Amino acid sequence: MDAYREFIDPSKVNNCVGCNFISSTKKNLIVGKGSLLQIFETIQLKQSTINKPQYRLKLIDQFKLQGTITDLKSIRTIENPNLDYLMVSTKYAKFSIIKWDHHLNTIATVSLHYYEHCIQNSTFEKLAVSELILEPTYNSVSCLRFKNLLCFLPFEVIEDDEDEEEEEEEDEEDEDEGEENIDDTKEKKDKKQSKTDTIEEDKNSTTTNQEPRLFYDSSFIIDATTLDSSIDTVVDMQFLHNYREPTIAVLSSKQEVWAGNLIKSKDNIQFQVLTLDLNLKSTISVFKIDNLPYEIDRIIPLPSPLNGTLLVGCNELIHVDNGGVLKRIAVNKFTRLITASFKSFQDQSDLNLKLENCSVVPIPDDHRVLLILQTGEFYFINFELDGKSIKRIHIDNVDKKTYDKIQLNHPGEVAILDKNMLFIANSNGNSPLIQVRYRDSSKTSDTKESKLNKIEEKEDNKDDDDNDDDDEDDLYKEEEEEETQKTISKSHIEFLYHDELINNGPSSTFTLGICSKEKFKCNLPNPNYNEVSILSNAGTDSQTKLNIITPTIQPSISSSLTFSQVNRMWNLNQKYLITSDDVNYKSEIFQIEKSYARMKSKHFINNELTINMHELNNGKFILQVTPKQIVLYDNKFKKRFTLNDEIKDDEILSSILRDEFLMIFLASGDVMIFVINTYNESYDKIEIPKLLDDTIITTGYITNSYLLSAVSKNVNLLLDNNTSSNKRKRKHSALSNSEGSKKNTGKSQPSTAAPPPPPKVNKVKTFVLVTGDNRIVAFNRFHGEKCYQLNHVDKFTENLSLGFFDPNQSTVDPFIKQIMLNELGDKFDTKDEYLTILTIGGEIYMYKLYFDGENYFFKKEKDLTITGAPDNAFPYGTSIERRLVYFPNLNGFTSIFVTGVIPYLILKTVHSIPRIFQFSKIAAMSISAFSDSKIKNGLIFLDNQQNARICELPLDFNYEFNLPMKHVDIGESIKSIAYHETSDTVVLSTFKQIPYDCLDEEGKPIAGIIKDIKDTPAMSFKGSIKLVSPYNWTVIETIELEDNEVGMTLKSMILDVGSESGSTLGSDPNSLIKKYNKKKREYIVIGIGKYRMEDLAANGIFKIYEIIDIIPEPGKPETNHKFKEIFKEETRGAITSICELSGRFLVSQGQKVIVRDLQDDGTVPVAFLDTPVYVSESKSFGNLLILGDPLKGCWLVGFDAEPFRMIMLGKDTQHISVECADFIINDDEIFVLVADNNNVLHLLNYDPDDPQSINGTKLLTKASFELNSTISCLRSLPLIDIEESVQTDALTNIAVPPPLPPNTTSNYFQVIGSTQDGSFFNVFPINEAAYRRMYILQQQLIDKEFHYCGLNPRLNRIGSIKLQNNETNTKPILDYDLIRRFTKLSDDRKRNLANKVSGKGIYQDIWKDIIRFEHTLNDL
């Protein structure tokens, strides 16, 4: 019984599109990262200038989908002609149409179209990823294509009366033309299937008397061969631009041709353009072109002004205009070898371009098409235009100086945004945001922009004014476009880099290492000592990075302090450090500038504990708050006045100061607000609304906010009457009341539009209070007795709205401990306001403030770290008081610090949602901002051992993801990573591409080489071994391997080394001990493969290195280690895997695995085993060994050292294609987690006592679990329960974390895994009782909760898995990502679901389980 948890989100951008999704005037960037859908907007930075504008991408929101995104398309529908809807295609053959709900500030599912059963029933092939295409001119039809099966979904379009008359005339003419109709019987059958397999959702109807009219028709499925009898195997299919009817271009092949049989057959590709008649489901052939080169595999439709299509092959480009005229370009010298019609090609073979996996981007309103190779080089495909006809096409190299800051590696889709900006999805590196700028004089550039603006204005005017003459508009538009083309044709382009999205993929390997081994920093224990970090690779070639993923933030500590007894501290204006001893009721002043010398002040209250210290007027005045007194001092601590008369006999619990406003909370449940005038040294009391006189107040906050901006001007927004309700529904609905008249008029007159932006007003001073019954109340300074509350905040509902305050108070049971309403962000953007709520159980809830077009609302952030639990389910988490501390500037971030036994830091970057990071493995009791000569905008925090550390937030880490990450550029692709613990270094096996010299074993050229293409050789690889120092993450030594040699696998092992003694096992009981009395030493073992062409055998070498200490170079303390070669041996067959086994090492070479013993004079083979194909994975656990084979599945082998032998224990009978594997240990149960090449995790169990296992010889498949990305690597890690890890400090009797690493040996082991899209996950064992609770809860969440895009979580995880064993998935692996959604539901919903799980006490048990799952990676 196990659970799966994804603890780092995917980051590789696979799909992207730019569209008017939220605003009709501004394009949004929408990206798909595996299962993560993100919506961005472009913002202009404050430091921008007219000549040098600077833009950034800002995340609006993200949504985790229950499926893998395979395509994104924007569509403009009759429901809302002002905004785009989004078509989200997910694996394997389904797509959802979604829109933006402005009122709820989230996506809304319009419809789900499901074709998987239909397609699977129509083909014998296993269903794989399908392709979604959309008609681009009128958005009249979409097509989901799986090979030759086409699923068409027609859409209704906005048509004019003239268009309808022309269509009627065309229909009459079409009756006399020959058409290829689809069989009527099949048509009816497909129509019935499409109706049963299409799910429509409509939640936003505004009409009550009639059903809303759908904007799409029934879908139908046909085979591509019915479009035209000449079509055989479809290679690619796309819709073309600027046709009045839906027109498709189809690439197809009639016979299989490849490079090996070109002598026998060439030019097998056919290109055909067809016009679709969606009503009759028939086609009309426009033109057909035969005998195209075999490796043409892509169609690129070109928009106006170029039109036509580009056909892309590996070795050529072909342009086909709308009349079927071809213009061909040969881009390398292979073209003459692969086609019989080379004479018709324009020869630009000297460019030597390789067009595999290139990106082709038509630049908007330009005569050039941008061609980006997979290596990142830019080229222009230039079209010489003569009016609307194309005279000539040629390819030009783009000067590298114009894009020197833009690095691309395997570029993918390109999204076109506003202001000539392009976003390029980069598969093997970061995805950049670039801007196309015309480099001529400002006059030329202005002319171009002004003309384009005029064209856009005319288009807008034509849409708004029905009385305009359309023909006259088109005439002027064409003239202006021609003028613009002339201007553009004379200009040069440069590409400006603005921003990029970080890509942590493809992550092919990782290891676990310690990044901070210093026991002490600044004379205090290092808070990050022995923390286990994840070291992974990302990117390829020049964009390769080494990622250091740490479990906590790594603060840069500059100095430290030690106290005898302190509970709280405050830094005042970088001059004074105030401390409060709550135990002895004492407060002290320390002067920072005088080496923290104590300062005596006769006015300062030092015989009481201090609740809070505040600064006023930029530190010129200081305010001290104690339980009984409030005193204002000058900056020399001379008393100016007190507020003691206001308090009388009451007791102060807490206080808040913002600007000149002071808010204090009393033990009686009252609150007082004062405005302090430091100029006159006086104060005034601000009266709170009288409605709150009888209300118990527990806490509150003072802020500058937009929250009450709308209701302060128009309180009618809160009136609950039918008129305003209907008005709001109409305004935010995607359907209009005028749809019913569209059949008669043929025109759409929808009332929907994007809501207006927030009014441009200044923030107002807002007082926020929390009542005893957990309501949040807000009012302005000049409130006029008006008071508002956030409805249902005590239930933590998904959205919070303002309402009038209800004076009727519920039962007083306060569980909200503290709140904040502040901006969060980084140096690029701090506009977003968040309401942060801390509960007494340590939970943190965050709500984002947004404007829906009428009023301000709050929306809950759902993807936050779980920090606490209700009902005392996590008492350890609150063993030290949790408090929120706001930092307006923490090294560039506006952030919130959370004190406690597990301290947290809340950060938000411009590219991410708010992230809650664990700050340290040690507790933080108090914290304050701090700056001095060493650090700027840092902090000082106090731990529970009375030690204070002054530190700053390191900016060389990235805080966009769930854990802090540091990226180190390597520059060469990484194959394997190892951490050498003894020397505290990291060893990398890297490789780079080199030209391949095709020689045989004797060094002679191999027969069959074509001499004419020597300047374009094939590529091979050259490996190297690099030693990296964590001191500054630089490469300190490199070992270059021979050409064609790559270090396939590399591991750090602790091996037994030494000579055998002469003793034998006899009467002497100590003889066996003597024989194996060897020294243990850590070595680096490298397995190398020598890879050449298929005619030559792949041999291998294994090498053993020791990392030794040396004297470092002057000024380079990191260079204190180097490699020392111990042994090497060549093998027959490449070495594909190595691992440590009981003090020895195993090498898989070819079809054999050999265990070797390391001795003083070399290595000795001691055991071997033959394998079927080759070993793709080998892992050990004690004397147990996993061997993974790509065809024959997984073996479990035992190793015995006396005598040396390898014993086959069990085999997998399903023949899983093993990519990687590792052990999961659940006390005395042994499991093997195996990842195959279909993105599926298989849990195998070795259980000799189970009769089905046949004495253990058969590994039982207990569960299978599908992931949304390819699994690349698995590593085992001890699992320590959070409750078992809690220890109690003997002096303070406070719960503290255990020493790191734990001294106890765990009987439980989990597995951490990486994927190609940059995400990381762990699979961990759980006990029977927790499994039952969580399984029932998971089923309830699947069935009862709403899922984005209408997707099914159950189908996502096990839908495509073929079960070959009756026992498989009787206890499936739990999806913790789904279960943790429980924590973000409203309180009523949570308790309702908990009651369905079990009876009494189940709510607390569920929370305990969730906390245990959330802390499974505590051993990092």
Swiss-Prot record:
<feature type="compositionally biased region" description="Basic and acidic residues">
    <location>
        <begin position="437"/>
        <end position="461"/>
    </location>
</feature>
<feature type="region of interest" description="Disordered">
    <location>
        <begin position="722"/>
        <end position="760"/>
    </location>
</feature>
<keyword id="KW-0694">RNA-binding</keyword>
<keyword id="KW-0539">Nucleus</keyword>
<dbReference type="InterPro" id="IPR050358">
    <property type="entry name" value="RSE1/DDB1/CFT1/CPSF1"/>
</dbReference>
<dbReference type="GO" id="GO:0006369">
    <property type="term" value="P:termination of RNA polymerase II transcription"/>
</dbReference>
<comment type="function">
    <text>RNA-binding component of the cleavage and polyadenylation factor (CPF) complex, which plays a key role in polyadenylation-dependent pre-mRNA 3'-end formation and cooperates with cleavage factors including the CFIA complex and NAB4/CFIB. Involved in poly(A) site recognition. May be involved in coupling transcription termination and mRNA 3'-end formation.</text>
</comment>
<feature type="compositionally biased region" description="Acidic residues">
    <location>
        <begin position="161"/>
        <end position="182"/>
    </location>
</feature>
<feature type="compositionally biased region" description="Acidic residues">
    <location>
        <begin position="462"/>
        <end position="483"/>
    </location>
</feature>
<comment type="similarity">
    <text>Belongs to the CFT1 family.</text>
</comment>
<dbReference type="GO" id="GO:0009410">
    <property type="term" value="P:response to xenobiotic stimulus"/>
</dbReference>
<dbReference type="Pfam" id="PF10433">
    <property type="entry name" value="Beta-prop_RSE1_1st"/>
</dbReference>
<dbReference type="GO" id="GO:0005847">
    <property type="term" value="C:mRNA cleavage and polyadenylation specificity factor complex"/>
</dbReference>
<protein>
    <recommendedName>
        <fullName>Protein CFT1</fullName>
    </recommendedName>
</protein>
<dbReference type="GO" id="GO:0006397">
    <property type="term" value="P:mRNA processing"/>
</dbReference>
<feature type="region of interest" description="Disordered">
    <location>
        <begin position="161"/>
        <end position="210"/>
    </location>
</feature>
<feature type="compositionally biased region" description="Basic and acidic residues">
    <location>
        <begin position="183"/>
        <end position="204"/>
    </location>
</feature>
<dbReference type="InterPro" id="IPR018846">
    <property type="entry name" value="Beta-prop_RSE1/DDB1/CPSF1_1st"/>
</dbReference>
<dbReference type="Pfam" id="PF03178">
    <property type="entry name" value="CPSF_A"/>
</dbReference>
<dbReference type="InterPro" id="IPR015943">
    <property type="entry name" value="WD40/YVTN_repeat-like_dom_sf"/>
</dbReference>
<dbReference type="GO" id="GO:0003723">
    <property type="term" value="F:RNA binding"/>
</dbReference>
<feature type="region of interest" description="Disordered">
    <location>
        <begin position="435"/>
        <end position="488"/>
    </location>
</feature>
<dbReference type="InterPro" id="IPR004871">
    <property type="entry name" value="Cleavage/polyA-sp_fac_asu_C"/>
</dbReference>
<keyword id="KW-0507">mRNA processing</keyword>
<dbReference type="GO" id="GO:0005634">
    <property type="term" value="C:nucleus"/>
</dbReference>
